[in-house]
Amino acid sequence: MKIGILTQHFLLNYGGIIQNFALQQVLLKLGHEPLTFEHDTCYSRTRWLLRTAKQILKTRSLKGLPVYPVYQGRVGNKNFIKFVLKNIRSVTVKDFTSGLTQKYGLDAYVVGSDQVWRPAFNLGPRLGNMFLNFADDKVKKLSYAASFGCKEWEYTKEQERACSKLARRFDAISVREASAVDLCKNHFGVDASLVLDPTLLLNKEDYEKVCNDIPKKEKHIFVYSLVVGESVMSVASKISEAKNLPIVVKEAGGKVKKEDTIEDWFAEFRDAEYVVTDSFHGMVFSIIFNKPFSIVMNPSGGNDRYISLLSQLGLMDRIIKDNQISSLESINWVGVNKKLEVLRHESMNFLKVNFNQTHGE
């Protein structure tokens, strides 16, 4: 089956690139032909400011404001682009139309993973695109591990009305967080399955193959942070002192260095003695590589994506509160891996069943 994937931009985003890589790898293993459609959109700053001002006036709220999209095509770290070109089959699309289905001979579309259903991350027509508003009724439509980014409802009434109609056209919907199951039911009137982020459908060995050529590093505390701040570094310093190990830091987004690579990022988890992170995918890869970790929550919210997975795996004690480290104890990885294997089987089953069914069954 030829499957078109819609997800967030590759950008300077380790997690965004890797979740798409993982989903394609899984679909390939299941015998399908995946193709990711990358948005080629560039908003002027003026247009973004006007859209933001309009939303503030309309909602009289500062919640859920659109994030300025600092991208245009494949602008970004050259090493990241090299990884994408080598490992992810993708095409750049400016306008999403029904003609895409015929042009690429697609049998199905899948939306996900990552925060594909968060309005602030999908300006203008992109939110409708993420609900496949351009796809006709003949093609199969699924979401896999779609995320709203938080448990609060951020849609305007107009967005909710439009997207709920589109969501009802899907053959099957799956989401990444438990709260998203409720949001789908309460606001879209649709049932959704809870599944794992696609990165968790691959195992440690799959990622080790990618970083095989990276030399082994000395033992260290690995800090991977969306924004390296005092809270993250305070925790890392305490653990560094307790374990007498150096700290290695990598940042996401605009702080990615030109020499950084996806392969080296995998190797940091492979070789780390301990991980401190405020990132969802930082937490995920600590689990995949069975590394003890501490997660520093974002005080501004959006933490449900962490809590949903940690609670499923019995790892809630890894959350840092008020910079107090509650547990440096080793994790019972045998128990965690057993739980993960059950969840992995259920998530794989969602893809197997729904892509094997005929559209409309």
Regions of interest found by a model, annotated:
Residues 1-361:
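Active-site anion-handling motifs in enzyme catalytic cores
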